[in-house]
Amino acid sequence: TQEIAEWTKQYDPSRLVNPASGGNHYQCGDMLDLHKYPAPEMYLYDAQRPTVLGEYGGIGLVLKDHLWEPNRNWGYVQFNSSKEATDEYVKYAEMLYNMVVKGFSGAVYTQTTDVEIEVNGLMTYDRKVVKLDEKRVREINQRICNSLNK
């Protein structure tokens, strides 16, 4: 990992290098990338590099007639309505907001769309339905982004 991260940085110093997304952390690269499901959490810190959450979330919501396989569906946590799933997303986003003051630098929600048997997406597998309340998601995401400018 360290050798590849150093080679990559030397090859193209203009790009950020993420040496290991989610595990096998070494003192190299431009960031420390953690994975935590379902709720976000910073459990490691590095004084030399920003800490990011490369994966979190996994909020499951099954929407009939928009599934890859109707009888096998999975999410880290399962909800029965868009409101419940959106409430959980907002709860996690509030946690991210509170982590900014502790040095938190970025996050990637898993995942943008449902894939095969995973129903964790913000949209359905067929991309026909946005599963969460777009207005509430946009508002909380903008609140987090704006807090990074302070």
Predicted regions and their residues:
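Short alpha-helical segments and helix-capping/turn motifs at coil-helix boundaries
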Residues: N18, Y37-P40, K91-E94
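Structural signal for conserved beta-strand scaffold positions within catalytic alpha/beta enzyme cores
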Residues: P19, D33-L34, L53, T124
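Active-site neighborhood of glycoside hydrolase catalytic domains
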Residues: T1-M31, Q48, K91
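Short, flexible loop segments at the rims of nucleotide/cofactor-binding pockets, characterized by
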Residues: G29-L34, A85-T86
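Intrinsically disordered, low-complexity boundary segments flanking structured domains
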Residues: V17-G22, A39, V108-Q111, R127
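Substrate-binding clefts and catalytic carboxylate motifs of secreted carbohydrate-active enzymes
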Residues: L44-K150
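Alpha-helical scaffolding within the catalytic cores
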Residues: D33-A47
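Catalytic metal-binding/acid-base residues of hydrolase active sites
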Residues: P13, G22-G23, Y37, G57-I59, ...
